[in-house]
Amino acid sequence: MRSQGTCDNAAAMSGILKRKFEDVDASSPCSSARESDDEVSSSESADSGDSVNPSTSNHFTPSSILKREKRLRTKNVHFSCVTVYYFTRRQGFTSVPSQGGSTLGMSSRHNSVRQYTLGEFAREQERLHREMLREHLREEKLNSLKLKMTKNGTVESEEASTLTVDDISDDDIDLDNTEVDEYFFLQPLPTKKRRALLRASGVKKIDVDEKHELRAIRLSREDCGCDCRVFCDPETCTCSLAGIKCQVDRMSFPCGCTKEGCSNTAGRIEFNPIRVRTHFLHTIMKLELEKNREQQTPTLNGCHGEISAHGPSMGPVAHSVEYSIADNFEIETEPQAAVLHLQEELDCQGDEEEEEEDGSSFCSGATDSSTQSLAPSESDEEEEEEEEEEEEEEEDDDDDKGDGFVEGLGAHTEVVPLPSVLCYSDGTAVHESHTKNASFYASSSTLYYQIDSHIPGTPSQLSDNYSERDTVKNGALSLVPYAMTPERFVDYARQAEEAYGASHYPAANPSVIVCCPTSENDSGVPCNPLYPEHRSNLPQVEFHSYLKGPAQEGFVSTLNGDSHISEHPAENPLSLAEKSRLHEECIQSPVVETVPV
């Protein structure tokens, strides 16, 4: 090994001779010239006396097999030519045709070899296929002509019997409009055709015994099952003697035995059409379910995508102010009088103040000062859960009350048509101490919106037809028709005792709702009703915790219809003239807009 590496080194250094792949000895462990060069370099470094690289001349390290396989895998296979071997035909004795004998085969040795390029081979295959297709179309044309002459075999014709394939010309067949590659397939050849091909190939004598053997094989394939009738004797039953089970696909086929009379030791198989039909239906249903599941998966993904896309925009809408206007706002005291819904301000801390303002503005109607969404209050979780439950109950009750009120309203609409006015409070009379906490209330004006015009009615008719019952909800007085059943107001009566944080109760009935929100300390104080027969029974409303000033107290008292003076004279420096001036400033320049209901 060392001497061989030394010789190679000398040959490489001289430059006269260079080792090639063909020169490598078969007994050499090297498999290529590149590996030999690597061995030379390793031997050269060992001979130089390098102490770092020890000598590898005493043993050989073969190249990695994995690396060699990887190098072979990177190469792509390219065919440059096609080699075709031709064999002569011989009698085969290997196939079983559907009829006759004289099977086709080939000799054990090829008689010629021919090479084609890829293009030449493709053209040659197309030519051969076209020739075979031409012969096939000629035979079809010949058969159609014979059937036409003999009238589908009912009439004998000498002319039809004398016709051959050679009588059919290429003009009679449409070969140009037929795709050869798509139409081409192997066709079975009849017995005469096979005999002619064998004689053309040089077969002088055709073995006739093959014909009898093929007939026996075909009969054995056609004959299946035993010949037993009703009963099977294991000693005479062919199925039992062959060691196979008796098979019954239908009545007496292929085996004629019955289930009770079969004595085959191997057993018995009976075709069950119900089981096959059930299996078929289950398979079809399973495939349909899988197809529906695949069709529903993209749809659900699209729905989730829409929900996720609209999710951020839907978030603030849940806390924004909803402007829900009832169908008719009817006032029983004075038909043409306007109702002023006050936008009060709360003196609470943080987000709780904003949410309570949201609830008061929602109950009192649509206010132009509540155009931006408010953040939810940081109340206790228990209170929020109670609020959600009560909201669901209130929505159900409101729907029922709305349906009942519409039915009751149909009998009184023609008798008591009243005007309705929707007032928007601008907050011009808001106290100066609240400008910092609610700055967006300070730049609006009081607007009166005429909802609809009706024929005024007398207070006596109104009180008789629409006797109301007072309901206090979070310090707000709700006027609802008396015709409703008292069971629907159970939850409303209970709300005066429970503390809610900014619950929204949509107005589902057409009654006027006057909301007087109160603070936590004054949550039990009710508002004054709009009807004179109830003002004597209820105390006057004090707005100490909301208006935070004596001017607003006098103004609210004036709106209630009496000249009630505050119980604290020391805290009320304003005179009656100033109160009247403040009242006139709030209601001056009304803007009336008719909204169809």
From Swiss-Prot:
**What PANTHER family does its record include?**
CYSTEINE_SERINE-RICH NUCLEAR PROTEIN 3, TGF-BETA INDUCED APOPTOSIS PROTEIN
Q: Where is the composition biased (Acidic residues)?
A: 348-359, 378-401
Q: Which stretches does the entry tag as region Disordered?
A: 22-64, 348-407
The entry's localization annotation reads: Nucleus
Q: Which UniProt keywords apply?
A: Activator, Apoptosis, DNA-binding, Nucleus, Transcription, Transcription regulation
Q: What is this protein called?
A: Cysteine/serine-rich nuclear protein 3
Family in the record: Belongs to the AXUD1 family.
Source organism of this protein record: Mus musculus
InterPro entries in the record: CSRNP_N, Cys/Ser-rich_nuc_prot
